[in-house]
């Protein structure tokens, strides 16, 4: 657990009733910042403070994962993490979530959870050769990334990222008017031999995400595959602050990826936020049995 810039009040933001919206498969864009950046930037001086309690988690929801064959249990565990995760030594209720390797069926189940029924959701599918949506092998719909917010979310988009044809990647993005913030969730190409073993596509994907720096308030959450010291992450560390980086902007942070024994082995999960925001961040020291990644939670204060 770290408090890299400022230990902020751990207050949940109460959201009004939200209309659930989901990104359509044809809603791809090349430049998110060109559509919403000016509207948020013009109001920069007048923006009220906002606190976003955000959690990012690669839930490993497909077949071959710890709970891949038990989707109902995985959805319950996600909801439990949202109800209370440790940040800055306190248990905090989350009002935003970024999920990776999640199936559309899991999101549908979460929408029926009592506490989450009023949340807004954005979903962006992973794709196979030719651009077809990648199906979850466990019958849970489409595999992809999702963003959920307690407050209403608008301008929901699927942001297609440069990717190898066999494993198409996208970011799911939406704007929360109550926070005057743009949120994007992503999972970059993996280092598998048949995906992006040399990292050339991840570099291009990170470059595309860097365009979001034009926004006044931004949170980008997800599994970036790379470790903090990787040069591939240089553009993001220059443009944003990472919630768990150490003093003097050192690129550190608690490890989020764990091996089959539950031992943490690397930090590959991140919450990049606007540098004007303050944040407190936390990763559980207890192994999770639901995934090969531990959730990363943060309280972000936009001032």
Regions flagged by a language model, labelled:
Residues 69-76, 196-211:
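Alpha-helical scaffold elements lining the catalytic groove of polysaccharide deacetylases
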Residues 37-40, 44, 96-180, 188, ...:
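Structured beta-strand-rich core segments of catalytic domains in phosphoester-bond hydrolases
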Residues 51-65, 157-159, 180-192:
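Active-site-proximal beta-strand elements of phosphoester/diester hydrolases
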Residues 53-59, 78-110, 148, 174, ...:
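Active-site beta-strand/loop signature of hydrolases that rely on acidic residues for catalysis
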Residues 62-65, 129-135, 142, 192-195, ...:
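A short acidic, helix-capping loop that chelates divalent metal ions and anchors anionic groups
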Residues 29-43, 211-218, 226-303:
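Metal-dependent phosphoester-hydrolase catalytic domains
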Residues 64, 106-109, 166-169, 192-195, ...:
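Extracytoplasmic/secreted cell-surface and envelope-processing proteins
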Residues 2-113, 132, 303:
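N-terminal, active-site-proximal structural segment of metallo-dependent hydrolase catalytic domains
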């Amino acid at each position: 657990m770290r408090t890299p810039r400022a230990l902020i009040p751990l207050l949940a933001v109460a959201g009004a009733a939200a209309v659930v919206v989901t990104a359509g498969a044809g809603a791809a864009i090349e430049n998110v910042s060109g559509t919403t950046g000016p509207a948020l930037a013009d109001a920069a001086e007048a923006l009220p403070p906002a606190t976003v309690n955000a959690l990012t988690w690669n839930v490993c929801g497909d077949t071959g994962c710890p709970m891949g064959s038990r989707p109902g249990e995985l959805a319950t565990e996600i909801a439990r993490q949202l109800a209370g995760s440790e940040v800055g030594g306190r248990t905090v209720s989350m009002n935003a979530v970024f999920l990776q390797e999640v199936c559309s069926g899991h999101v549908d189940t979460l929408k029926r959870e009592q506490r989450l029924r009023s949340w807004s959701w954005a979903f962006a599918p992973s794709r196979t050769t030719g651009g077809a949506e990648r199906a979850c092998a466990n019958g849970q719909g489409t595999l992809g990334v999702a963003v959920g917010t307690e407050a209403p979310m608008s301008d929901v988009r699927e942001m297609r990222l440069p990717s190898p044809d066999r494993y198409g990647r996208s970011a799911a993005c939406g704007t929360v008017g109550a926070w005057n913030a743009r949120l994007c969730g992503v999972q970059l190409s993996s280092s598998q031999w048949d995906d992006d073993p040399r990292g050339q596509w991840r570099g291009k994907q990170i470059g595309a995400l860097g365009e979001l720096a034009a926004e006044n308030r931004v949170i980008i959450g997800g599994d970036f595959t790379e470790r903090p010291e990787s040069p591939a992450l240089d553009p993001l560390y220059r443009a944003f602050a990472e919630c768990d980086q150490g003093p003097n902007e050192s690129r550190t942070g608690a490890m989020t990826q764990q091996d089959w024994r539950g031992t943490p082995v690397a930090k590959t999960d991140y919450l990049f936020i606007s540098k004007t925001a303050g944040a407190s961040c936390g990763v559980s020291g207890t192994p999770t049995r639901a995934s090969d990644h531990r959730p990363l939670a943060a309280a972000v204060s936009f001032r």
